[in-house]
Amino acid sequence: MRQGLAAYQATGSERHWPYYLALLADAYGSRGQTAEGLSLLAEALAPMGRPGERGWVAELHRLQGELLLAQAGDRHRVPEVETCLHQALDVARHQQATSWELRAAMSLARLWQRQGKRQEAYDLLTPVYCWFTEGFDTADLQEAKALLEGLA
């Protein structure tokens, strides 16, 4: 994947570059290489002033929070994780990006569930999930439903 991104970058195109970096960061995170993933997310968030690239900001912040949580392994970075996830929620809401909002809400709800804040997690996720009227066979909505059932 890294080679493919290098080849793409060599073309001089920067279109969707933050998104591609986010995909690679997520892959690194899945392999436990959180430092590499966080470095890529920092790079992805840097050019967010460019027109057309702001659509990924919510997901970038969510992934940053997820990787920070995976890296921390303890409670010392939880405030930083929560800040990232709240930023993801705020950006998604401002952009009216319901799919990104659902993902951010699920991430924050899972964190709160681990902290014993089950009711807060349920109250956060329920209205976001209820906005959807279709697509209930998608992975995100199935995951949200399962999370809500576990919180109820």
Name each model-derived stretch.
Residues 1-152:
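Helix-coil-helix junctions within alpha-helical repeat/solenoid scaffolds
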